[in-house]
């Protein structure tokens, strides 16, 4: 398959949503946004994001925040382990990195509450490090692009898809590329209902569109059956 990055980035620069953590993609802002957007829609998270940053504008402020105030700022978002891990990580960053997130994928990945995806997002978007940031949107795009019926919830399959993602990533714009894939999955190659193929910059390359199988993808692993003895 020909490289997708040029067509994808052209589309992204013309069609991406204007979001505060894109306008100012500093490491703290990107990290906070990615944690808030876990299990929460963008439209719902934005007021919390802006209020949180107004109260705690940097990592040292987050590290020093009293628990009651911290939970009040998070109230309504749910999944409170997210904000507890945010503060744990902030305190480690203050102790070990002078209050600034490290410009290193592995160091980011080692912080509480930061998994492969969030580490990749911060590293690529804020620091320009050529690493993947693969979420459900990206897996869906690549499952359809290659018309691949493999179950994306399987670790080995996700690893193979991640390798494909990296084959197309331009070394000079890893953050924009990662965001473009996420945006394409969120706005065009949507999970529920028919994908908006007529608006997709990759439609001419999409194997699932050609085969008429886009609605069947991505596939997830079948649940294990219980055997009663």
Residue ranges of predicted features:
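Conserved small/polar residues in nucleotide/adenosyl-binding loops
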Residues: 227-229
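An aromatic/glycine/proline-enriched structural segment found at the starts
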Residues: 221-222
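Catalytic cores of DNA base-excision repair glycosylases
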Residues: 2, 6-7, 11-198, 202-211, ...
């Amino acid at each position: 398959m020909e490289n997708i990055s040029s067509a994808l980035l052209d589309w992204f620069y013309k069609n991406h949503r204007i979001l505060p953590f894109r306008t100012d993609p500093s490491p703290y802002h990107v990290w906070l946004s990615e944690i808030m957007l876990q299990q929460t829609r963008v439209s719902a998270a934005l007021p919390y994001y802006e209020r949180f940053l107004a109260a705690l504008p940097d990592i040292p402020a987050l590290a020093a925040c009293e628990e009651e105030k911290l939970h009040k700022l998070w109230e309504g978002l749910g999944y409170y382990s997210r904000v507890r891990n945010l503060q744990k990580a902030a305190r480690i960053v203050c102790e070990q990195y002078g209050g600034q997130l490290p410009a290193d994928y592995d160091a980011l990945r080692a912080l509480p509450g930061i998994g492969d995806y969030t580490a990749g997002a911060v590293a690529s978007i804020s620091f320009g490090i050529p690493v993947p940031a693969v979420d459900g949107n990206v897996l869906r795009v690549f499952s359809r692009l290659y018309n691949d019926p493999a179950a994306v919830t399987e670790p080995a399959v996700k690893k193979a898809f991640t390798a494909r993602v990296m084959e197309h990533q331009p070394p000079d714009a890893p953050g924009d590329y990662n965001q473009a894939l996420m945006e394409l999955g969120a706005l065009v190659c949507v999970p529920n209902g028919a994908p908006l193929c007529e608006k997709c910059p990759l439609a001419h390359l999409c194997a699932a569109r050609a085969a008429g199988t886009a609605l069947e993808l991505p596939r997830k692993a079948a649940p294990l059956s219980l055997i009663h003895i």
